[in-house]
Amino acid sequence: MPPSSSNTAAASRSASKRLIKELETWSREQKEEKGIERLGPVNEGDLMEWEAVINGRGIGQGYDEGRWLVNISIPSTYPLAPPKMTFVTPIVHPNIALQNGEICLDLLKDAWTPAYSVLECVRAVRMLLGCPETDSPLNVDVAALLRSGDVLGTRKLVELWCQDSDSRYEGP
């Protein structure tokens, strides 16, 4: 086996061990977690593809009635590299691309360290909903509303979007 293949296999084993520990942590903390309804692998046999279902209860900014499915792709080099997270359910937010669900959050890019877990990333993404960063928008229209000071208009837009059946995850 070439060295690069053995390094990849070792990294993947290391990632799997870490993810199993993170799943154990989630199973202990799940009952107290109000904003994350579900977190874990999509299929039992693949630890590298996860999903989370998050809700907007208590976030404010119009997101309280929202419920979203988030895809989490974990690289074989995890925890040295961050997971890639995208919203599957459409969402209106300055830091989330409406077209593809891409999330702009430093924690998932340059600010990543192996000290973070997938659960902490999901919590951070959920927190981002209530604390938008208009300096690095992926949805420039919503960011422009906020920058212009139209907080009420933005909240009403988000509320309308969260109540639309096509923009609310209705699965398990």
Curated annotation (Swiss-Prot):
The active site is at residue 104. The keyword ATP-binding applies. SUPFAM superfamilies: UBC-like. GO terms for molecular function: ATP binding; ubiquitin conjugating enzyme activity. GO terms for biological process: peroxisome membrane biogenesis; protein import into peroxisome matrix, receptor recycling; protein ubiquitination. It catalyses: S-ubiquitinyl-[E1 ubiquitin-activating enzyme]-L-cysteine + [E2 ubiquitin-conjugating enzyme]-L-cysteine = [E1 ubiquitin-activating enzyme]-L-cysteine + S-ubiquitinyl-[E2 ubiquitin-conjugating enzyme]-L-cysteine. Its EC number is 2.3.2.23. GO terms for cellular component: peroxisome. Keywords: ATP-binding, Nucleotide-binding, Peroxisome biogenesis, Transferase, Ubl conjugation pathway, Virulence. Pathway: Protein modification; protein ubiquitination. Disruption phenotype: Impairs hyphal growth, conidiation, conidial germination, and sexual reproduction. Leads to a defect in pathogenicity and production of the mycotoxin deoxynivalenol (DON). Displays lipid droplet accumulation. Shows reduced tolerance towards oxidative stress. Leads to down-regulation of protein expression levels related to protein biosynthesis, fatty acid metabolism, cell wall synthesis, and oxidation-reduction reactions. It comes from the Eukaryota. SMART domains: UBCc (SM00212). PROSITE patterns: UBC_2. Residues 14-167 form the UBC core domain. Ubiquitin-conjugating enzyme E2 that is essential for peroxisome biogenesis and plays a key role in development, pathogenicity, and cell wall integrity. Required for long and very long-chain fatty acid utilization and is involved in lipid droplet accumulation and the elimination of reactive oxygen species. Controls the expression of proteins involved in protein biosynthesis, fatty acid metabolism, cell wall synthesis, oxidation-reduction reactions, as well as of the enzymes involved in the biosynthesis of the mycotoxin deoxynivalenol (DON), including TRI5, TRI6, and TRI10. PANTHER family: UBIQUITIN-CONJUGATING ENZYME E2. Belongs to the ubiquitin-conjugating enzyme family. This is Ubiquitin-conjugating enzyme E2 PEX4. It comes from Gibberella zeae (strain ATCC MYA-4620 / CBS 123657 / FGSC 9075 / NRRL 31084 / PH-1).
